[in-house]
Amino acid sequence: MKKYLFIVCLSCGMVFSQDPLSGVIQYQDNNKTYPLIGASVFWKNTTIGTVTDIEGTFRLERAPDTDILIISYIGFKTDTLKISTPFISHQMIQNLQDELDEVTLTQRRRAYQKSLIQTQNILKVSSEELLKAACCNLSESFETNPAVDVNFTDALTGTKQIKMLGLSSPYLLISEENIPMVRGASQAYGLTFTPGTWVESIQIGKGAGSVANGFESITGQINTELKKPITDIPFFLNLFASVNGRYELNTHSNHKFNNYWSTGVYVHGNKRSQKFDNNNDGFLDLPVSDQINLMNRWQYTNLEKGWVSFLSWRYMNDEKLLGALSYDPKKDRGMKNRWGSIIKTKRMDASFKLGYVFPEIPYQSFGFQTAYSSHDQDSYYGLRTYDINQQSFYTNLIFNSIIGNTLNKFKVGLNYSFDDYVEQVNGYSFNRMDQNMGGFFEFTYDNNDNFSWIAGFRMDFHNNLGTFFTPRLHLRYVPIEKFVIRLSAGSGRKAANIFAENQTLFATNRIIKIQSKQGKIYGLNPEKAWNYGLGLSKSFSIGSPHQITLSSDFYITDFTNQVIVDWEHPHEISFYNLKGQSTAKSFQFEVDYYYRNFLNLKVAYKNYNVQIDYKSGLMQKPLLAKNRFFANLSWESKITSVGKQWRWDLTYHYVGSQRLVNNFIDHPKGFSPSYSLWNTQLTRVFSKKFEIYLGGENIGNYRQIDPIIGVEDPFGADFDAAQIYAPIFGGMIYSGLRLKI
């Protein structure tokens, strides 16, 4: 098989030596031309560099002391070009057939990347990083990075919830290829509906995000990029099994019809049929579950004319059975014989994306996105019922260009969203329709050398939230080489879907109280907050093999209005609007160490101070560890001539004590004990096509004692399975294999 590398570099705008350089990098495989995504492009002996995007294009600021450009990518020989004129049209064709086996790997793309060049504080997690843990789905994809905290939501569903900057996932904008995904009805379980093997990369942005992505992000944005048919391998198979009775199958099948059209079919299935009660309380530690997940993607790419488009559809069916070990839904539903629950969810998604880059003006482009989703959940918890159906439509139009030169960029666009909710709680209906039309403008001064900034604003017209203005600002300053200071500020707001976001309340017998009737959504007013952030990053080397990055950030989220979820009364859960103050302060310090790209150590300390004015007074948010410590050690052996390799990973989590609400019998008005968790995985790569892995989670077997309050009387007023501060199941061993053809 012959591969050729094409490099076309074009300077943009006026003929001045300081003007940035733009270009496109492509490769040819069997006479077919494809964009080379993720290629490193940098000026020799400098830190000024970038990577190519999904179209293979890049834009790079000029270096003051060199005109030597280096382009590198794994599997291709590193190329060096002399850029001698301000306007250049260069094409290089190189036959690499006889040199591929002799390439010396001097630098590989890191699976965990914190950029010093980007203005915003964004962490990129690649699919290689996700292989370090049992990433069966998106909710389990954050165990090996310190930016996101992962916790179980209750003692029954086995569902994991993520938190960032001390606040739960509803305050995050969780998107899929920049289309809002986990929101509304899918907030509780939506992260479990994206299989881990489908994920190409995850971008985690802290603080106020871009106005182009909407107004709902308050603490940040998590965006998932899925595998692309044109770059994914033709066939992939993953088999997974664990001692907790979970079995999983993942297959990817991709086909390229010609230079323009590609398609991929992705199948995921998981099943847990075994029942476990390791703590002997008569309740299942993990639900009996069954899920099927299908996706088909079509991709059209025409680099010569500047077009790229995606058409995707997905179908998912998920069922969970939880509750008492001997619960039989056919006999016991609606009765007080045994407590049980069934959660059935069906979801369908369809999306279309179209992008155009002007061939003669590569810095100018427009994009169009539209998506439809149908989410239907039928469920009951003991004697309580909860059903929700959400029909959503979203569309986005965006135009990118420059003002004068490519240092001054802007984007402008329109968003429209529509959500129709049909919701029933114990027979009471809470139906509503949300519609929003918004416009945005964002300006970027993109000077990678010393100072860059992004300022954006948007205006939205929402039928339930009103008309409102959203400003956001990001600053980046480089006082000395490889030392970056970032500042950010911005506002956000959202409608609180109080039942969908807090489905753990149905795992209790608490009385539900909504203590407001003034707002348009459940009688409550929308949530509004400002987020402010400061970040510091410094990279340096200790000799050529040792590379270290020190980073710290401090964020404050200040709510001007919030829907308070009050668990303080042992037999009630109350929802009401904030009267007083609610502030979340988050501090993180991280050390990231690399040795010759084969050994990586990440260490982080996090501190949270989240204070809320409840009706009973100002208190720290319950079930939130004020102090957390994280460490991850990864090692990879050198790849042999036949592709064999060992990979090993060890992760440590220390979770500090957490404030408990008043109905904890063992710790009345107190705090939970602190604890530690250890996870590890060993992978043996036999060739480029086949590998096996063996891992363990919570190998110290730490468990919360008596996780269900009032378990002896599940229909009594004291029953509460929502007060969870630690794992329930204990240790878990898993194994699997991956086949790539």
Q: What are the functions of these language-model segments?
A:
Residues 86-93, 138-141, 160-163, 175, ...:
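N-terminal periplasmic accessory domains that precede
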Residues 26-31, 37-44, 72-76, 86-131, ...:
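Short, acidic, small-residue-rich periplasmic hinge/interaction motif at the N-terminus
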Residues 58-61, 161, 179-206, 294:
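Short acidic/polar hinge/loop motifs at secondary-structure boundaries
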Residues 272-293, 299-366, 372-390:
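Flexible loop and strand-edge segments within Gram-negative outer membrane beta-barrel domains
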Residues 4, 601, 654-661, 683-741:
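C-terminal beta-signal and adjacent terminal beta-strands/loops
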Residues 446, 550-558, 577-661:
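Gram-negative outer-membrane beta-barrel transporters
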